[in-house]
């Protein structure tokens, strides 16, 4: 009996350690895969970025950039114009090349924070940088997020230069805010790049569906976290919850409004691309989520949404 108990304990420790990757490298159990928990999203099968070959592009000099970038004219505001050019100069200095074996597929402009790329930062950076399209394909920065999409549609909000996610997908701080479609739509209406629109639509639709499946309460409203919204310095969760890491068991207004905005954008994209089947649910989502917000989150007294 004593021998059986010891054998059971050893076996249990081995299995537990395997799940936590704690077994020594020489152990025959070391390379056993962890259970695959992905629920596959069919739209991800259309994601061409996941199998795209990396393409590196070195930006030309800042002097060349000044000849092709939009040149502002604002009489009496020379300092502001100097700031404009300085912003471009700094941005160009922060163009990075994808590391070998990282899985990144495009040269990209980095937020210049900790060496990682951030969903929030790069969405806004590409909105600004679309005006520099004649100089450098800054929009391709977002390709690196798309190339890292998981089989269920998840995209991590922060990804290291080596291509690894900074958070597990079920971490409350792992993703968001969902602003990538906004950047892509602005790019499309300015340049009419049908080829890019066709490539990004299934990626963005799959990510939208992941959020709907994994970031909602039973009534269809959305939750997030301080890091997930990008507003970690705005305390709003009840006392006892962490401002940065917790959802506070709350309905998060900004996350709800972003999904309404994104659903509208995906509707427009789907209309142009004739993806009628995929966009049906977006109309229903807009209607039901808007109705909830107007009924429960609008203050007649303050004239404000909470």
Regions found by a protein language model. Give the residues of each.
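Low-complexity, Ser/Thr/Pro/Gly-enriched N-terminal "stalk/linker" regions
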Residues: 20-115, 140, 292-297
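Short helix-capping and inter-helix turn/linker motifs at the boundaries of alpha-helical repeat units
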Residues: 1, 114-118, 202
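C-terminal capping/lid segments that line or modulate ligand- or cofactor-binding pockets
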Residues: 117, 170-176, 180-190, 298-306
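Alpha-helical support elements that line or immediately flank enzyme active sites
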Residues: 115-149
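Active-site acid/base region of carbohydrate-active enzymes
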Residues: 68-93, 132, 145, 150-154, ...
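Bacterial Sec-dependent N-terminal signal peptides
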Residues: 1-20
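The feature captures the catalytic groove of carbohydrate-active enzymes
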Residues: 25-54, 111-112, 154-179, 212-284, ...
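Well-ordered alpha-helical scaffold segments within catalytic/enzyme domains
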Residues: 65-78, 123-136, 179-196, 257-276
């Amino acid at each position: 009996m004593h021998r059986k108990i010891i054998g059971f304990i050893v076996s249990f420790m081995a299995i537990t350690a395997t799940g936590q990757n704690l077994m020594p490298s020489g152990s025959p159990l070391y390379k056993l895969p962890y259970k695959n928990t992905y629920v596959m999203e069919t739209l991800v099968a259309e994601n061409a970025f996941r199998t795209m070959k990396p393409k590196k592009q070195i930006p030309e000099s800042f002097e060349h950039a000044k000849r092709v970038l939009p040149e502002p004219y604002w009489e009496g505001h020379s300092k502001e114009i100097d700031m404009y050019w300085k912003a471009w100069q700094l941005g160009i200095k922060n163009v990075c090349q994808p590391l070998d074996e990282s899985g990144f597929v495009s040269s990209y402009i980095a937020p210049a924070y900790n060496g990682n790329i951030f969903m929030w930062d790069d969405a806004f950076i590409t909105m600004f940088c679309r005006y520099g399209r004649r100089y450098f394909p800054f929009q391709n920065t977002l390709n690196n997020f798309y190339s890292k999409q998981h089989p269920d549609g998840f995209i991590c909000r922060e990804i290291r230069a080596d291509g690894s996610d900074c958070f597990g997908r079920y971490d409350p701080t792992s993703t968001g805010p969902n602003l990538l479609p906004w950047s892509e739509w602005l790019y499309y209406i300015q340049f009419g790049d049908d080829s890019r629109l066709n490539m990004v639509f299934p990626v963005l639709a799959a990510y939208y569906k992941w959020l709907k499946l994994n970031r909602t309460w039973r009534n269809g409203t959305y939750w997030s976290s301080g890091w997930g919204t990008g507003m970690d310095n705005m305390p709003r969760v009840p006392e006892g919850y962490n401002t940065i890491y917790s959802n506070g068991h709350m309905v998060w207004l900004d996350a709800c409004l972003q999904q309404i905005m994104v659903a509208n954008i995906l509707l427009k994209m789907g209309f142009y691309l004739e993806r009628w089947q995929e966009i049906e649910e977006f109309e229903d989502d807009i209607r039901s989520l808007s109705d909830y917000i107007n009924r429960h989150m609008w203050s007649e007294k303050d004239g404000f949404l909470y």
